[in-house]
């Protein structure tokens, strides 16, 4: 298996991405706030990369991608989803499994509300909440560290706290630098947009999804309320809401030996179902 890196220009930003040489259905992986595509290293270093075309990219304002050309328009859930859609189109991806972690999960849900390529959705650390502050409060824990997700400028202490919040003691040394590099305007823009109720009603998108939806969370996730996921009336939930024992907010990084087989099994399900599903039409661009 080989991994190639490239930069793709979109109207929103220049996006740096990595992709494996696997020939199976693409799995597009979207990282969380303050992270980068490097967080999916343990999926690339697994049989998944041989079985599927794994694609991970740095969101605008993150990693090796450029900052947004128009921060006000791009640094929202809708703007990031539109950026992802442009990338899929540039890569000629007509069908894919979208795996979104944390912020990336919310971007994935928004993308699924309008883009025809989404054949399956994997959500980790990303509760599909209704619009506005009440929906947010139902899906997320209310604690002081959550305020970091909307803070524009980080001190070194903030960087340390956010790293521990997301990864506990499991972080790679490079993860702290990824947090430091992040364009803080994204944090404030995304948080404002979500509390203002902008974008799709994520709960409705997931409840009405015509494709399989996998929910895989960490047992000790400090950000999200695991009980909330059980209140969602999924039309197409795969198996059940899976919980990775002993993991926190990033179970795919902390416990890849448990996470990767679930992702592989879900992908097999999506491939089989996609063979008989009608082609979805793009509702918006």
Enumerate the language-model features and the residues they cover.
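Glycine-rich nucleophile elbow surrounding the catalytic serine of serine-hydrolase chemistry
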Residues: 100-110
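Conserved alpha/beta-hydrolase catalytic His-Asp/Glu region
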Residues: 132-134, 152-207
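Conserved HGGG/HGGXW glycine-rich cap/lid loop of the alpha/beta-hydrolase fold
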Residues: 13-67
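Flexible "cap/lid" loop of the alpha/beta hydrolase fold
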Residues: 110-150
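Catalytic active-site module of serine/aspartate enzymes centered on a nucleophile-bearing elbow/loop
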Residues: 237-285
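Conserved loop-alpha-helix segment in the C-terminal half of the alpha/beta-hydrolase fold
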Residues: 47, 210-247, 253, 258
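Active-site loop/oxyanion-hole signature of alpha/beta-hydrolase fold enzymes
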Residues: 55-99, 261
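Conserved alpha/beta-hydrolase "nucleophile elbow" surrounding the catalytic nucleophile
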Residues: 31-33, 96, 100-102
């Amino acid at each position: 298996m080989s991994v190639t890196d490239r930069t793709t220009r979109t109207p929103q930003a220049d996006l740096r991405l990595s992709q494996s040489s696997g020939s199976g259905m693409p799995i597009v992986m979207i990282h969380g706030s303050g992270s980068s595509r490097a967080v999916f290293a343990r999926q690339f270093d697994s049989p998944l990369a041989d079985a599927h075309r794994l694609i991970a990219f740095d969101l605008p304002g993150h990693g090796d991608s450029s900052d947004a050309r128009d921060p006000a328009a791009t640094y929202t859930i809708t703007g990031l989803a539109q950026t992802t859609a442009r990338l899929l189109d540039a890569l000629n991806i007509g069908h894919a499994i979208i795996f979104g972690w944390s912020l990336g999960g919310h971007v994935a849900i928004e993308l699924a509300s309008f883009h025809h390529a989404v054949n399956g959705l994997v959500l980790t650390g990303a509760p599909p909440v209704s619009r506005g502050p009440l929906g947010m409060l139902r899906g997320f824990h209310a604690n002081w560290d959550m305020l970091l997700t909307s803070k524009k400028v980080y001190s070194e202490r903030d960087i340390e706290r956010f790293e521990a919040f997301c990864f506990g003691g499991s972080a790679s040394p490079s993860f702290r630098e990824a947090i430091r590099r992040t364009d803080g305007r994204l944090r404030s823009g995304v948080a404002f947009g979500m509390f203002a109720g902008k974008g799709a009603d994520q709960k409705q998108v997931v409840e009405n999804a015509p494709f399989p939806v996998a929910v895989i969370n960490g047992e000790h996730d400090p950000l999200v309320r695991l009980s909330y996921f059980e209140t969602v009336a999924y039309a197409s939930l795969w198996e059940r809401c899976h919980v990775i024992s002993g993991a926190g907010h990033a179970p795919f990084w902390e416990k890849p030996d448990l996470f990767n087989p679930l992702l592989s099994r879900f992908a097999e399900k999506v491939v089989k179902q996609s063979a008989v599903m009608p082609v979805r039409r793009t509702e918006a661009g």
